[in-house]
Amino acid sequence: NDPCEEVCLQHTGNVKACEEACQ
């Protein structure tokens, strides 16, 4: 899994936002 998304989810829990931010 993408480490960016992993970290993002730990902070926000928002999968959609993390996918957008990390693409």
From Swiss-Prot:
Expressed by the venom gland. This is Potassium channel toxin kappa-KTx 2.3. It comes from the Eukaryota. Its main location: secreted. GO terms for molecular function: potassium channel regulator activity; toxin activity. The lineage of its organism: Eukaryota, Metazoa, Ecdysozoa, Arthropoda, Chelicerata. Coiled coil: none annotated. Disulfide bonds join 4-22, 8-18. Keywords: Disulfide bond, Ion channel impairing toxin, Neurotoxin, Potassium channel impairing toxin, Secreted, Toxin, Voltage-gated potassium channel impairing toxin. Has the structural arrangement of two alpha-helices stabilized by disulfide bonds (CSalpha/alpha 2(S-S)). Decreases the amplitude of the potassium current of the rat channels Kv1.1/KCNA1 by 33% and Kv1.2/KCNA2 by 8% as well as human Kv1.3/KCNA3 by 70%. Belongs to the short scorpion toxin superfamily. Potassium channel inhibitor kappa-KTx family. Kappa-KTx 2 subfamily. One of its GO terms (cellular component) is extracellular region. It is found in: Secreted.
